[in-house]
C-alpha cells in the first residue's frame, strides 16, 4: 500500500500514516453548529477532508468517516427565539440546508452524521464516569465542570502551558468553578431553554463533551485521524483530549489534522464578524468546480485569502479544464478506457506522490493542469490515442480523487455563470457612470431593475458588489 505522510498537530511533525487497523482509516471531522447556512469558511474542511477520504480510498484504504452536527447550542436557541420557532426546527432546517450545500459542492456524505441530542444519555453516563474518577465535579447549581489541573499535560495539542493560561486568564466571575480554566460538561437549564434529565439538574451538554462521546461510540476508544479547522485546536480539541483521556486513559485520535482559515481583508471569515460568503452564492457565481479549485489551490494547512478576483481566476481555470474535456467528448462521445502505459503511470505516480506528501493539493492540481495541456496538444496534433489517455487521467483519476470535474452539466453552468457575471458587471459599470454624472434617477432605475431580477447591488468601500437571491 502507498506510504502516506501527514502533518500531525499533536506531535508537530510530518509522520507516516500507520493506522490502528491495517488497511482501515477511521476519521472524525468536527461539523457545524446548525443555526445558519454554511459559508466558504465552513466549506474548506468539508472539501479538504472529503478529498483526503477520496485519496485514501484511491490508494487502497477503507475509510470510515464521521462528521457530527451540533444541534443544541446557545446560537441555535437564540436563532429560534429571534424567529419565534422551536429550537429543533432551526436545527432540522439547517441540517437539511447543509446537505443541500454539500451536494452543490459535490461533497460526499460521511458514513455517520451523528447529532448531539441523540447521544445525551451517553453524554450523561460519560460525565458520571468522570465525576467518579475525580476528573469532574458538580457545582451548587447543577452545572458540571471538568477539572483541568487533574491532567498534567493539558495543553499538549495547542502548545499552551497551564500556568501561562492561568496567568493570562481574565478574571472569571463564575464562582461555581474551582479554577477559572475548568470548562463546562453539563449546563443547568435557563428558563425557556430545552432541557434533559441528569443526576445533577435538568440541563444540556456542554460543547466539548459531545465530540468525545460521539467519536467513542461510533469509532471506538481510539481512532486514526481527527480533523477540523485550526480554530478548533484550542479549546475544543484540547478539551476533547482531556475528556477522552479521563474516560479511557488515552487520547481519542492517533493523529490530528487541521486546515487553515479563510481570510477576508485580514480577518478570519466568520459569522460573528459579518464577513461571510455563503456556499450556495459562491457556487452560483463561481461554479462548483471554481469554488473547489479555490479551496484546494493552497496547502490545506495554509491560510487562504478570499476575494472576488481569486474566485474568478479559479472559475476560469475550471472552465479551461471543462473546455478541454468537452472538446474531446464532442469528437468521441463515449470514450473507452485506455491501456495504462508508462507515460500514464508516470503521471499517476507524480499525482499520488504529491498527495502522499501531507496531502499537497496545489502540486496535484498543477499535475492536473499539465495533463490538460497535454490533452489539448494531442488533440491539436491529431494524436487521438494519446488524447484519450490524457482525458482518462483528468476525468477518471484526478477528478474523482479531488472531487472535481465530475459533471457534464458543468459546461453549460460555467458558461452561463461567466456570461451572467460579465453582464451584471457591465450594468454596474454603466450605473457607476450615471452616478458619476449625477444622473441618480437612471442609476437607481438600473439598481431597481436588477433587484426585480433578484440581483442585489452592494455599494462597498472596495466598489460595487452583487449577490443573487433565490
Curated annotation (Swiss-Prot):
Pfam families: DALR_2 (PF09190), tRNA-synt_1e (PF01406). A motif ('KMSKS' region) lies at residues 268-272. GO terms for biological process: cysteinyl-tRNA aminoacylation. InterPro entries: Cys-tRNA-ligase, Cys-tRNA-synt_Ia_DALR, Cys-tRNA/MSH_ligase, Rossmann-like_a/b/a_fold, tRNA-synt_1_cat_dom, tRNAsynth_Ia_anticodon-bd. Zn(2+) binds at residues 30, 211, 236, 240. Its EC number is 6.1.1.16. It catalyses: tRNA(Cys) + L-cysteine + ATP = L-cysteinyl-tRNA(Cys) + AMP + diphosphate. ATP binds at residue 271. Keywords: Aminoacyl-tRNA synthetase, ATP-binding, Cytoplasm, Ligase, Metal-binding, Nucleotide-binding, Protein biosynthesis, Zinc. One of its GO terms (cellular component) is cytosol. A motif ('HIGH' region) lies at residues 32-42. Binds 1 zinc ion per subunit. Its main location: cytoplasm. GO terms for molecular function: ATP binding; cysteine-tRNA ligase activity; zinc ion binding. SMART domains: DALR_2. The keyword Nucleotide-binding applies. Its cofactor is Zn(2+). It is found in: Cytoplasm. NCBIfam families: cysS. HAMAP family: Cys_tRNA_synth. Monomer. Belongs to the class-I aminoacyl-tRNA synthetase family. This is Cysteine--tRNA ligase. The gene is cysS.
